[in-house]
Amino acid sequence: MKLNKLNQKHQFEWFVGFAEGDGSWQTDNSNRSIFIINQQNPQILYKIKKLVGYGQINGPYENKNGSTYYRYRVGNLKGTKRLIEIFNGNLVLDKTQKRFENYLKVYNTQVSTKEIPLSEKRHIPTLNDHWLSGFIDAEGSFSGIIQKDP
């Protein structure tokens, strides 16, 4: 099944929000850009891999608490370029924007083609896009308290 353009746009908005909640923009010892998401549910990672078109999923791993998790990782140049196209100008949080800037800078030192400039545009989420649902899927929780009337 092919994604229609509107549905695909929503999926990318969701992915950016999810990545801002659970993603990690890193550089390794070889000065390469690497993007990682760790998740207990591997099915989410497979959906992300299909959406992006790049990456590897490894695991299961066990953390210090004994919980099992899986890892989505993109470290090759083609996959990194694709992620840059998705994230550049679409991030919301200052902390992820700063990490992304370094990620982009390192990528630009790796390629011999024209550098990709950092977009000055910033995404402002609304209730009509899917960034917030992605971020909540990564970081959110809801709770309620039922109290008896006095």
Which residues are covered by each model-predicted region?
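Internal intein/HINT superfamily modules and their associated LAGLIDADG
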Residues: 1-150
